[in-house]
Amino acid sequence: TLLASSAASDVYKRQIVKVAGLTLNKVPECNVSWTNESTKLFKSSDISVAVAIDGGLITPIVRNVEEKGIHKISSEIKELVEKAKNGTLLQNEYNGGTFSISNLGMYGIKNFTAIINPPQSAILAVGAGQKIPTVNDDKIVISNIMNVTLSCDHRAIDGAVGAKFLQVFKKIIENPMLMSL
């Protein structure tokens, strides 16, 4: 779950939320929900962040992520998590998200599959970052690697579209300067 646990993880998770919002703008076919009548496409990226609370889980929403800076996203997440923990979230603060993120990485979990939060059609599972040796310009270097998994409702999002989302997400998260474009 996305929770405030340290300054480093706070920076990391707000970047993930921002990158997901930017990615949804570039791959709007993933910013959808399935209904019995049709697939509903959303214009704004309203990201639900999973928060563990006593007795379960709740998913407060950071709305219009694509329009906000990382510091604004961070302050909203902090406020929403606090309200979730205190049981003071208003219904409109946890209903109506268009996409979810679940982060078990903060518990050291490297890889997992998250369950879609209906009526949304996708959820991004974020695993723990780990330092591993990689090859860069024919040299072995230590890199921070994070596993993410995208679960999609295939009635609304085809596998190829989900793969496109992950490609764009990877490109942006690995090139942070793209967040400001």
Describe these PLM feature segments.
Residues 6-181:
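C-terminal catalytic/motor cores of large multi-domain enzyme assemblies
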